[in-house]
A protein has these predicted regions:
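Bacterial N-terminal signal peptides that target proteins for export
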Residues: 1-10
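Pepsin/retropepsin-fold aspartyl endopeptidases
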Residues: 22-174
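N-terminal signal peptide c-region/cleavage motif recognized by signal peptidases
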Residues: 18-20
């Protein structure tokens, strides 16, 4: 009799617990599915950059040129930098530094990078991303979008690229 109790209890538990796939999908109907590479519209002017949606990265990073940190009014940290879009157009930005991030390098050691808030739109998903300014010249993608921006907004299809409809409705103008 004791031998029958264990299989019956196990069957009851399995019947009451939803399969993992079903549990994971709850609450995700309103999320946008995007490829792991998409066009990302950056800043108020909608500068278009080729970006990687990286679920393996916590934070976001953008290839910024001519980065110079300075004190505004002698106290607050500000940064001036340039971003270049896919079409070669360059836009200069000047804004406050939210914080500085220590980034671990693959070669060992760390580097200190300024972090800013940058409006972005990808596949119609808009938001303010916390982005560190980096020299990404040796990387294939000018902007990397990490989990902090993607969470609760985007599901990334790792087998697809450029599947987003252009729902950002921005034009590259000055």
């Amino acid at each position: 009799m004791k031998l029958l109790r264990l299989p019956i209890c196990a069957a009851l538990v399995l019947a009451l617990v939803p399969p993992p796939a079903m549990a994971e999908r709850e609450g995700r109907d309103d999320m946008t599915v995007l490829g792991y590479v998409e066009d990302v519209h950056v800043g108020k002017l909608g500068l278009e950059m080729k970006g990687k949606l990286d679920t393996g990265a916590d934070s976001s990073s953008v290839y910024a040129r001519d980065v110079k940190v300075y004190k505004k009014s002698g106290k607050d940290d500000w940064v001036t930098f340039r971003l270049r879009g896919k079409n070669g157009r360059t836009v200069r930005y000047d804004q406050d530094v939210r914080r500085f991030a220590l980034i671990k390098l693959k070669t060992g050691g760390t580097i200190r990078r300024p972090v800013i808030h940058l409006p972005i739109c990808v596949g119609g998903v808009r938001g303010l991303a916390e982005v560190n300014l980096a020299d990404r010249e040796d990387f294939e993608y000018d902007i990397l979008i990490g989990r902090e921006f993607l969470a609760s907004r985007v599901l990334v299809d790792s087998a697809s690229t450029f599947i987003a409809d252009d729902e950002c409705n921005v034009s590259e103008r000055d």
